[in-house]
């Protein structure tokens, strides 16, 4: 601090010395500095040489005079010294302050100049940015009729920069031009210029749309209402009526929007944003000029029609004024295009702004313009791709972006598809249980709705395997369709089954159908089959010399000469009296509806006069059959078919001789007749028939051991008219019946249960018990029409079989049989062993494990199980009348009983087991 003060004092002394000198000079007192003698001459010479220089600088060397009593302006105080010190120590601070002052002054001047320039700019842009002037400048950049071969693209960014305006102002111009098809949108901020090339066509379309929307009538009504409103300003009722009328004439967006390029069909309603866009309002505004008779439209009328918010004027005036400004923008652009001009309309309250149409007045129809443009206009689009040429409207342009609109119905379609897919995905998908043969072979479902389709599919697969159907007679070739309806029936109950040569099982019906029956060939899969047999009540009257026989074919050579037994009908002299009795018996009812269905069926052959058939005709048919048989036996594979052969009685063939016994023939009588036929079997080279070693009277279901010949099997297949229905292994169930009081010595073994269809009779049928094993079976006599034990049966159920057979036309929908007398009902209790008069046959191929190769039918013997159907009977004594009810079959509880004596039955044989009722 001391050093600083000393320096400050020296500076003060230096600064004060010149002031003292001046003061002394002014007063005349001069101070002279004393001179000292020079010791050295050298020094003196040196000082003398430097003296003139110092004189020049310091002036004359005179001693200053001392100023006496000189008053000081500032007192010497510590504060003054401090001020002097601060001012001397901070010269740079003073410079900075001066610089800041200069900068602030310059900035103020610059701000004033900038504000002035901005004011000038705002004043200029307000004038230059008017939409009409901008539209004039914009149209001056492009020709009215451009060359389509050149690039006529427009970039809004470049145009806004060149015109020194905002891009939003250019958007207003482009929307109005796009509504008139003078430009088309290519991309964002990219447009294509078309000019006035399509202006006439656009105006024609707009004029047609305006007429369709009744704009002219609407304008007249608005003018009339406005005049009435002026007269009744204070009438509230008049205003309400006006609002109602206005609402009835409001135009929605779809009708007001013309089908123009860029006029998107998605502009839906009058309240939508798209409908009130500048482009759509511009189209409607032009429509008003084109349809009005004096082409002058006031702005308020146009606002009421286009904006459609006249009733909201009092509620929101600012909103309505904003939309009025949009109409002004449209009018300014149209004025720049020289289509309209502004005028004033004088009314009662004064002048109102209006616009008059100055554009083309004679506008042709759109069709004429289309014809002229297609014939004369150049075609620059031919070189472009087909996608670009596919436009959604009349005004397609080269290079424009195509916008395809999704129709609203597609949205509903997509929703419905999604709902269906959701239902399918949410449906239960439990696996199907497949057991036994169903997993290995063709699986047949147990559902009723699919059984008929599965049977048809099975037949189609058989035909697709390349196995040709076995040919039948010439008369049966025209009737190969499997439409054997209820007219294809067979014999009555009590008929016998004699053993015939050539391994053919011949059924001798007394009442035969004149129609040729046909059994559908089935695919040989080893599975069981159910053969449906038609009821007696639907069978037609028999014809003479008609014989049906059944066999299962096997490939034989052309030298097969054996033929099935030819049997005569009941009009021959050697026919048994029992059959004659059966023919005249009232049990054999006349057909009810079979004859009608057979007459109208073109796929069947009918003989009009059955009794007039002569043996000569039968010989001709038999000769033709034999001639065709020799040609077809070599190339026919093993398939099952049904053939009909007409023949006369042969002397070499044995005839069946029966007495006048009743229908209650015993099995012994039947076996005795079979022994008589063994002689003919030996002559034909057949294996003798083996009788079962048991008492047939004790068997409820007797069996017949039918051994087929060891030689070639005959190719003729004859069976009573029926159908083979494939049955899966699920339908084969095992059950045991409880022991009966009167049949306690009989045992129950696993059996196959087949149930008849409840269509022919009114009483419930009972299960048929047949087994291919060596154990006999017994049956409990029925106590009540309701089964006391359930049957376990998976497939097929009687309802399924009824459904399938009725759909295929095999059985009628409902049959009401005629009642019988007690004598007639008693005759049905024990029919003769043979094919029953009605019911179903269950065909079960047996296992080919045994070595009886001569009995195999393509390696698989069959077992015929017939289920008769009962008819309505008159109750005897105190028996209650039994009604027919359908019960779902379920399984019986098993009961172990005493097994009777076993009967040896060869496995490879053909067993026919009737049932006693």
Curated annotation (Swiss-Prot):
Any Pfam family matching the protein: E2F_TDP
Biased composition annotated in UniProt, kind: Basic and acidic residues: 93-103
Acidic residues: compositionally biased ranges: 105-117, 233-252
Alphabetically ordered keywords of this record: Activator, Cell cycle, DNA-binding, Nucleus, Repressor, Transcription, Transcription regulation
Composition-biased stretches (Polar residues): 16-27, 37-48, 371-386, 595-605, 815-830
Compartment(s): Nucleus
GO biological process: cell cycle comprising mitosis without cytokinesis; chorionic trophoblast cell differentiation; hepatocyte differentiation; lymphangiogenesis; motor neuron axon guidance; negative regulation of cytokinesis; negative regulation of DNA-templated transcription; negative regulation of transcription by RNA polymerase II
GO molecular function: DNA binding; DNA-binding transcription factor activity; DNA-binding transcription factor activity, RNA polymerase II-specific; DNA-binding transcription repressor activity; RNA polymerase II cis-regulatory region sequence-specific DNA binding
Main location: nucleus
SUPFAM superfamilies for the chain: Winged helix' DNA-binding domain
Region (Disordered): 1-122, 221-252, 353-386, 461-497, 556-615, 671-698, 813-834
Presence of the UniProt keyword Protein biosynthesis in the record: no
Disrupted-gene phenotype: Embryos lacking both e2f7 and e2f8 contain multiple intersegmental arteries that completely fail to migrate from the dorsal aorta. Gross morphology of these embryos and initial formation of main axial vessels are unaltered.
DNA-binding region: 126-195, 273-359
Gene Ontology cellular component terms for the protein in this record: RNA polymerase II transcription regulator complex
Family (UniProt): Belongs to the E2F/DP family.
Subunit and partners: Homodimer and heterodimer: mainly forms homodimers and, to a lesser extent, heterodimers with e2f7.
Name of this protein: Transcription factor E2F8
Record organism: Danio rerio (Zebrafish)
